[in-house]
Amino acid sequence: MSDAVYGWYKSFNAAHGMVMSFLKFGVLATLGEMLGLRISAGVYNRKGFGVLSRAVVWGILGMGINMAMIVFSKGVPQFMEYMGMADASAIINGDCCLDKLWIALAVSVTMNTIFAPVFMTFHKITDTHILDCGGSLRSLITPIPMARIITHLNWDTQWNFVFKKTIPFFWYPAHTITFLLPDEVRVLFAAILGVALGVLLAIAARMK
């Protein structure tokens, strides 16, 4: 990437962080789901899959992820200082060192333990709703029948694979790396992980 392009990215990202989060996740996480469909069904798209609806939903979810990353990356170091670790807030934004690694791990574990299960369940609900609407854009304006979808979710897969396996064995280390990166590229890296998420969702789908 040229210095000019990276400079534009940094300035636009700093001024319009939520817009960039919408675009990053809307594009990259949707591509990840298309890759997941390719793994599970042999095609990148099919009738009823709802690529555009998924892109919009992922964009909105991406803004929520950006918010969560800000809240936890600021709040966890503050709590660590409250518990006695000096300068945790400065260390997480400084050069890479062992202390920064531990803080990044703490941020990742806290965020993925508290936020990720709710996020993953809500994503599954929206995904089911899009499929129930035949992939149509009307899924974006049709009320989600929350009680019905939650009742019929495959909680065995959600708990035993999505929560118990992907969170500790993939998302804890993946987001530890994320929080070691400079602030302006964390959300971009998290969006790139959406490709990996698509693969994981494909594996979960095969476990039904």
Where is each model-derived feature located?
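Juxtamembrane/disordered regions of integral membrane proteins
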Residues: M1-K208
